[in-house]
Amino acid sequence: MSHHVRLSLLSLSLLTMSLGTFCSPALAAKPTDPLAVAASVDRILKENLAEEGVAPADLTADEDFLRRVSIDLTGRIPTPAEMTRFGLDPDPRKREKKIEELLDSPDFAHNWSAYWRDVIFMRATEQRAQPLQGVFQMWIREKFENNAPWDEIVTEMLTATGDVRENGATGLLLAHTGDATELASETSRLFLGIQIQCANCHDHPTDTWTRQQFHELAAYFPRVRVQQRPQAMPPTFEVSSFDVNRSGGREILNNPERLFRGLDLNRDGKLSEAEAERAQRFAAVFQRLLGVGDTDKDRMLSLEEFKTLPTPPQGRRQTTEYFMPDLEDPAAEGTRLDPVFFVDGQASPREMRDLERRAELARKVTDPNNEWFAKSYVNRIWTELLGVGFYPLVDDMGPLRDVRHEEALEALAAGFTASGYDTRWVFRTILNSEAYQRTLDTPSGLQNNDSCELACATPVRLRAEQILSSLMMLSGQTEPNRDIVVGRGPGSRRNSVQAQFVALFGFDPSTPQDEVSGDIPQSLFMMNSPLISQLVSSRGNGPLARLLRQYDSDEDALRELYVLVLSREPSEYELNKCKEYIYDVQNRNEAFEDVMWCLVNSSEFITRR
């Protein structure tokens, strides 16, 4: 039998084995106690499942729990040493303590900053924003490291200004070039779980939202400006406000000489960048004005150049107010709308400046009385951790949407709100629940082809960086510098293995798990890339070479290899199959390379189970 045929048969046999303050009656006296809320959620789920004649699956074994929680919190599989220490620990509270340990690790912030980077940028409408996504990741990673509350993080994203290379909070605004309708859509989808953009051209077909409500939400954003700084190196963008319709804000249009005299501090007839920096409101737009008005390219503006500056555009209207388009006459100005938040129906004052409008929107979005803010975050994290959510989609919730186990969701959302929007509280509560810690086994009352819902664990495909981080752990790099950066300067992106891997394996985390699948380029990478070839090599000082030198017994080496790659020991069937293969090949190193290659290419390796 040829080597390739033997390898194919082994691979086949192994691969088939793998694979708002709102009240909730569920809350006890201490709504922020994670263990109490977790127990309450478990009780609700068990009662609901019992009504359907379903008994939940048992709790998973320690090794499966450790692999699952390590991937979910740190983005990588555990090391064999971590597996051994956890397995030998007799403490009955060791799972709770491991959760705390991993929440406090630097890898937690890295893993979840990568998650939100992908959430924000996978649907970016401004493709020039892609090379700058690393700046956003570094910013939100620091927020997670400091355990900043979710309402603070969201508020900073909605109210950000400045150079996008210096302020990562501008990532959302940059990703959509400050477009008012796109920002309204994403604000609602990401932070409220509501797809109000379906009401852009007509009233929402399957919910209560109207077209006017969508455009009133967009009216919070018409004064946002995202423009490229033409002379900056490396290339960058500036997020600023242009409040030309506010009294006193039209000087550049109505009285340019007066404004020029006020800014020209040294009276030399030229406006320099240093002089512009002294005027806070003018400094934010000076680079952009240079780009369009500096005709002699001396990096300053004369009075004549200043007087010829164009007015700030908004489509054909030359205004910074918001107009809902007229569908019958697209060329018409449309209907002017003032900002109104669709959840509470309350209008915001018309005279507000841009930053005041955005701050007011952030206050309304994160208000404890707005139940959708807490529910959206809780449902998103629950879905990511358990593979199935309370709503079918993490970003399509709403009053008319189907919801499962609503009382459990309300208990979690109320606790999250009471905690002060502590993001770690959500992880701590969910991970300590029995619902999270169940096995994959189909429970009593369900057929094999039925969905487990929350009666048993649901396999989840790993995100790109989780796969890469796990591969790097296998190679011995347990704390690699994994940040994705492209170009020059802070937060820029280099042509790295990480960047290539994310480009190849990345997907929008908002996508339902049953719609996430691999493709041929991904398979070819895992089968043939130099990274994998080096990883499974029995030569040098790689993980397999070290393992084979340490264990003379093939059976012992196989057991250790399975623990290394899959975080578990092989079954008797797998053990016997591998031993037969090693005997047939008659070359120990070559046979073990094939076995490790099969394990790394198995569906089990790239799945959180």
Predicted segments, located by residue:
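Boundary at the C-terminal end of the N-terminal hydrophobic targeting segment
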Residues: C23-A29
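Primarily short, surface-exposed interaction patches in extracytoplasmic proteins
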Residues: L35-A61, R67, I77-D107, F121-E251, ...
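Primarily EF-hand calcium-binding motifs
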Residues: P256-N266, F286-K297
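Long, His/Glu/Asp-enriched segments that create or flank divalent metal/ion-associated functional microenvironments
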Residues: S475, R482-G491, N495-M527
